[in-house]
Amino acid sequence: MEAVVLERSIVVKADRERVWRAITTPEHITKWFEPIRFERLAVGEALTFSWNGEGSIALVEPMDRFGFRWQIAPPHPAQTLVVFVLETVPEGTRITMTEQGFEALPDEVRQARFKDNTQGWEHMLGELIAYLTSREP
């Protein structure tokens, strides 16, 4: 089966360091995404989401790329991989978010989760822009 990838890109008027903190620090993530817990920013570190979902940190390249895996359709064990890539642009920072791995889900679940996550990321990236353009991070 062909890979199913969700991709969105936004540009925000914030420097990379500020964006990096917002996407990799639990106290900041909670402000724009949802409550999430982890102890260390390290590959393999377990993540716990507010809805009792679980995952793990999959990629840490400071100031450049951050990724995590999460189970998006419990009880189905498949996990998708979410990756944020940061790039400095004249307007601030471009954030490109991809989520892949949907093809591991059964057809009916895959279609529903892809649609839900597409809408969800549109909303969450809007929340991230709002958070980054506030005074907080």
Protein language model features and the residues they cover:
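Hydrophobic ligand-binding cavity/cleft-lining segments
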Residues: 1-38
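Hydrophobic pocket/interface hotspot
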Residues: 19, 29, 57, 66-68, ...
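Tryptophan-centric aromatic hotspots in well-structured domains and transmembrane helices
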Residues: 20-23, 32, 51, 68-70, ...
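Hydrophobic-ligand binding "helix-grip"
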Residues: 38, 48-94, 100-103
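A conserved amphipathic terminal alpha-helix motif
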Residues: 101-137
